[in-house]
Curated annotation (Swiss-Prot):
Residues 23-86 form the S5 DRBM domain. Keywords: Ribonucleoprotein, Ribosomal protein, RNA-binding, rRNA-binding. Part of the 30S ribosomal subunit. Contacts proteins S4 and S8. The gene is rpsE. It comes from Rhodopseudomonas palustris (strain BisB5). This is Small ribosomal subunit protein uS5.
Length: 191
């Protein structure tokens, strides 16, 4: 018991390294920015990073600094603070089709059968790869700004519900919900 609560850096830093190693990070976008000051322009860099554990947790972060590696580090730290959990069907795709939006950017995400792969444009592909989705079809409409596309994708994923969550919200059994889904032409009864 006392060994578990020991103070000191080695064990704690090793645990932190293990926790950090479980995440996969993708650099989505790097941008050179300028701040106009009295003596001229002061240049810096802004980075957009997406991280995930490829098991249903994903987050994105934005970081700014004078040097690229520092901006990426800040963005990665921000992404770790911004992690969200997404319920996946069979651990490989979405439960249902969904749309998301942010600003002028709209994204449409569709569940896909096994073997389809990730059919999505740049920033959305990074989100799906770090999330652990293997089969999805995605379309972006409107703004192609990477920030808007990533935020719109997260907006869509935020509204994704598993059958278990829907059944709990409606106070019905999951099997009842699944039978309605499989039936297709079966009449849906409002509750």
């Amino acid at each position: 018991m006392a060994a578990e609560r020991e103070r000191g850096g080695r064990e704690r830093s090793r645990d932190r390294e293990e926790r950090d190693s479980e995440f996969v990070d993708k650099l989505v976008h790097i941008n050179r920015v300028a701040k106009v000051v009295k003596g001229g322009k002061r240049f810096g860099f802004a980075a957009l990073v997406v991280i995930g554990d490829q098991k249903g947790r994903v987050g994105f972060g934005h970081g700014k600094a004078r040097e690229v590696p520092e901006a990426i580090r800040k963005a990665t730290e921000a992404a770790k603070r911004n992690l969200t959990r997404v319920a996946l069907r069979e651990g490989r795709t979405l439960h249902h089709d969904i749309a998301g939006r942010h600003g002028a950017g709209r994204v449409y995400l569709r569940a896909a059968p096994a073997g389809t792969g990730i059919i999505a444009g740049g920033p959305m592909r990074a989100v799906f790869e770090t999330l652990g989705i293997q089969d999805v079809v995605a379309k972006s409409i409107g703004s192609s700004n990477p920030y808007n596309m990533v935020r719109a994708t997260f907006d869509a994923l935020k509204h994704l519900d598993s059958p278990r969550a829907v059944a709990a919200r409606r106070n019905i059994k999951v099997s009842t919900l699944q039978s309605r889904r499989v039936g297709g032409d079966a009449e849906v009864v409002a509750e």
